[in-house]
Amino acid sequence: MNVLSGIGEFLVLFGTVFYFLSTLGLIRMPDVYNRMQTATKSVTLGSLSTIIGVGLWALGEGLSLAWLTKTIVIAVFLLLTNPISAHTLIRGAYKSGIPLWEGSVVDKYKEHLKEKEGAE
């Protein structure tokens, strides 16, 4: 085993830990908005580290550089699309009338909508 394989294995393990933390967040958070925020952040980081780790692991084991290139392309795509899709889902949930948790103290989107209505 060389250094790249070791780094790749560490990143895969690191990603697995973040997947576990995401699962805990889905269970522990009180409403859909907090759950989506927890899931998006930890799954994005977990997926990125796992994907890059697999690419480095494959490169360290003597496979072609194409493995690393493909995993980097996939990671960039995931980094760009995962937060955008989560934002879209949360916005759809808000517009559908799913209430915030009663412990939520700030609703900036509601304030934004009121300002937008007042400007028209």
Curated annotation (Swiss-Prot):
Any one GO molecular function term: sodium:proton antiporter activity
Pfam family, one: PhaG_MnhG_YufB
InterPro entries the UniProt entry points to: PhaG_MnhG_YufB
Domain of life assignment: Archaea
NCBIfam families according to UniProt: CPA3_mnhG_phaG (TIGR01300), PRK12674.1-2 (NF009314)
PANTHER family, sorted: ANTIPORTER SUBUNIT MNHG2-RELATED
Similarity section: Belongs to the UPF0091 family.
Name of the protein in its database record: UPF0091 protein PH1455
